[in-house]
């Protein structure tokens, strides 16, 4: 097993972890309904890029 030779300081530990944070997923607004949804995903009403692609219960 690998064992560290010297203790890593809190500063170095933080620098090592600096890129591990989570980012907020980008949201898109559907132009026809005005609803927000994840990019490249169908909106809750079944619209994708201005077109109705899925029939929903309300249809």
Curated annotation (Swiss-Prot):
Residues 1-59 are annotated as: Disordered. One of its GO terms (molecular function) is structural constituent of ribosome. InterPro entries: Ribosomal_bL32 (IPR002677), Ribosomal_bL32_bact (IPR044957), Ribosomal_zn-bd (IPR011332). GO terms for cellular component: large ribosomal subunit. GO terms for biological process: translation. Keywords: Ribonucleoprotein, Ribosomal protein. It comes from the Bacteria. Residues 9-19, 49-59 have a biased composition (Basic residues). NCBIfam families: rpmF_bact (TIGR01031). Belongs to the bacterial ribosomal protein bL32 family. This is Large ribosomal subunit protein bL32. It comes from Cupriavidus metallidurans (strain ATCC 43123 / DSM 2839 / NBRC 102507 / CH34). The lineage of its organism: Bacteria, Pseudomonadati, Pseudomonadota, Betaproteobacteria, Burkholderiales. The gene is rpmF.
């Amino acid at each position: 097993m690998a064992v560290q030779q010297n203790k890593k300081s809190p500063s170095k530990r933080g620098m090592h972890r600096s890129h591990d944070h989570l980012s907020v997923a980008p949201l898109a607004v559907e132009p026809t309904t005005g609803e927000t949804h994840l990019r490249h995903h169908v909106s809750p009403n079944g619209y994708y890029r201005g077109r109705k692609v899925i029939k929903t219960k309300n249809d």
